[in-house]
Amino acid sequence: ISAEATPLSPFTPRGAYWAAQRRFTRLGRHWSTGVKLGVDTGFDSGSTLDYVYQNRPQGRNAFGRAIDRYYLDAVGWRGIRQRKANIGQAIQTATQHLREKGKPVHVLDIASGHGRYVLDALAAEALPESVRLRDYSPINVAAGQALIAERGLQSTVSFEEANAYDR
């Protein structure tokens, strides 16, 4: 077994740190909506990313919301929100260039999560000819379809369940 695969002893500083992190996560999920969502669906799931994009702390009480605020302010989640802004800017720039050349705009995202970052990037006054969102998770597809309906974009945006590695 390599050193990377050997469990850390809880009696070492690193082992104690990670053991405490696991305990705090298990405890925090009882109060913090974001931590619970991460534990339930995975911290890299589309549901968790959508929650992080919204950046609104929620919890069972003020203590839970404080935990959630701390969780949402983590440097990694701040980076994810910046990535969303960068993707939105890239979509808007590409759309502008295509429009200037008189070409149609079609957007495809093959691993959309809930699709919020694409939907947020769409300019209502100049919607693309089509937007096609895909994700493998039925939970993400249902949430994405609800966002599309909420924004009245059914005529332009579609969301289908499909694996990014399938054709």
Q: What annotation goes with each model-predicted range?
A:
Residues H114-L127:
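Conserved SAM-binding loop of SAM-dependent methyltransferases across substrates and taxa
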Residues G144-Q145:
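Conserved SAM-binding loop
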Residues A124-L127, A149-Q154:
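Short helix-capping segments at alpha-helix termini
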Residues S137-I139:
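Conserved SAM/SAH-binding beta-strand->alpha-helix loop
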Residues A5-R99:
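Conserved Class I S-adenosyl-L-methionine-dependent methyltransferase catalytic core
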Residues G102-G113:
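Conserved class I S-adenosyl-L-methionine
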Residues S130-D135:
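Conserved SAM-binding motif I beta-strand of class I
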Residues G152-A164:
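Conserved SAM-binding strand-loop segment of SAM-dependent methyltransferases
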